[in-house]
Amino acid sequence: MDIMQTAVAGSLESSDIMITVNPATDGITIDLESSVEKQFGRRIRQVIEETLKHLGVNGVLVQAVDKGALDCTIQARTIAAVHRAAGLDQYNWKEIDSWNV
């Protein structure tokens, strides 16, 4: 999936995460800001990266501002931001459910 434009999903409310995706030339770069980064930073990055790989995204800069989001919220916000950035409004729920993340 190609990132065509900058897109955002989520909020800065407690227990949420704001994911901003930007087009990049190659690779996946994740810039994380979180009050729990020392404890959960590695896991937050892992969930974002795995979700991007499942979606077939390469060439993206992700800015994530975490406010204590659970893994399922991180995944959902990443999926929404990527679909918006790619200009897609249809989700393949069967495929997403098959990830077992």
Curated annotation (Swiss-Prot):
Annotated coiled-coil segments of the chain: none
Keyword Transmembrane helix: no
Subcellular location: Cytoplasm
Record's GO cellular component terms: cytoplasm
Keywords assigned by UniProt, alphabetized: Cytoplasm, Phosphoprotein
Main location: cytoplasm
Domain of life of the organism encoding this protein: Bacteria
Residue list for modification O-(phosphoribosyl dephospho-coenzyme A)serine: S14
Membrane-spanning segments: none
Subunit structure: Oligomer with a subunit composition of (alpha,beta,gamma)6.
Function in brief: Covalent carrier of the coenzyme of citrate lyase.
Family: Belongs to the CitD family.
Protein name: Citrate lyase acyl carrier protein
Gene behind this protein: citD
